[in-house]
Amino acid sequence: MTHQTHAYHMVNPSPWPLTGALSALLMTSGLAMWFHFNSSMLLSLGMLTNLLTMYQWWRDIVREGTFQGHHTSIVQKGLRYGMVLFIISEIFFFAGFFWAFYHSSLAPTPELGGCWPPTGIHPLNPLEVPLLNTAVLLASGVSITWAHHSLMEGNRVQMLQALLITITLGLYFTLLQASEYFETSFTISDGVYGSTFFMATGFHGLHVIIGSTFLTVCFFRQLSFHFTSNHHFGFEAAAWYWHFVDVVWLFLYVSIYWWGSYSFSIDPMQLTSN
């Protein structure tokens, strides 16, 4: 091994970008086969190889940063920029769902009955399970901040307690969201309301599951003493991601659950005259 005279991480050759690309190809091809031929075998294979690739790739990153010392302050700065750009891309991802919802609801077409929610759709009560979900996620935002401050102060026990509370609240939110889906009187195939509702809330639920997994990994890493008060970007990235999930839910609650549940109609004569 040659002597390194700079603070940058020169990565070693890795098979994971190639296996990740191949698994993504299998997943997208498998998704098309599932839609058209009702066969989920290729999709399952793609998901399995993708999960294995992610596990082994992130395992190598943990080894490089925690045990080999490659994540210097300059490298961590680059990782922070990368995480910020990733969250920005996620913002635009969800912006598409909000755009579709408001485009359809602010000027409902005659096919929808000229009203919103569309004729025949009975929206969920925003003051029941959605409000409880909001309280759960806001509480999880408080507990993850508590965990972060405890880590900064070197209080390992409180950090683990707060992190476990956050993970539990994330699991509780997921269970509430799943129970809510079973109670809805509409499905994803019930026009534009059903498709935008389930796409937006479903992808948010997927992000909650991903964030909970991220935090669970951080919990076990903290049990193994991987984090210190000045070297914990893995946890910091998970906390940023969780706060992003919180903020997206607030927009979802206000837009889709609260504002979108109030009925209003448009006079068809006004549409034709304009």
Curated annotation (Swiss-Prot):
GO terms for cellular component: mitochondrial inner membrane; respiratory chain complex IV. It is found in: Mitochondrion inner membrane. Residues 35-40, 106-128, 184-190, 257-274 are mitochondrial intermembrane. Its EC number is 7.1.1.9. Its main location: mitochondrion. Pfam families: COX3. The chain crosses the membrane at residues 16-34, 41-66, 73-105, 129-152, 156-183, 191-223, 233-256. Gene3D superfamilies: 1.10.287.70, Cytochrome c oxidase, subunit III, four-helix bundle. Keywords: Membrane, Mitochondrion, Mitochondrion inner membrane, Translocase, Transmembrane, Transmembrane helix. One of its GO terms (biological process) is mitochondrial electron transport, cytochrome c to oxygen. It is an enzyme of class 7 (translocase). The keyword Cell membrane does not apply. PROSITE patterns: COX3. Residues 1-15, 67-72, 153-155, 224-232 are mitochondrial matrix. It is a multi-pass membrane protein. It catalyses: 4 Fe(II)-[cytochrome c] + O2 + 8 H(+)(in) = 4 Fe(III)-[cytochrome c] + 2 H2O + 4 H(+)(out). Component of the cytochrome c oxidase (complex IV, CIV), a multisubunit enzyme composed of 14 subunits. The complex is composed of a catalytic core of 3 subunits MT-CO1, MT-CO2 and MT-CO3, encoded in the mitochondrial DNA, and 11 supernumerary subunits COX4I, COX5A, COX5B, COX6A, COX6B, COX6C, COX7A, COX7B, COX7C, COX8 and NDUFA4, which are encoded in the nuclear genome. Component of the cytochrome c oxidase, the last enzyme in the mitochondrial electron transport chain which drives oxidative phosphorylation. The respiratory chain contains 3 multisubunit complexes succinate dehydrogenase (complex II, CII), ubiquinol-cytochrome c oxidoreductase (cytochrome b-c1 complex, complex III, CIII) and cytochrome c oxidase (complex IV, CIV), that cooperate to transfer electrons derived from NADH and succinate to molecular oxygen, creating an electrochemical gradient over the inner membrane that drives transmembrane transport and the ATP synthase. This is Cytochrome c oxidase subunit 3.
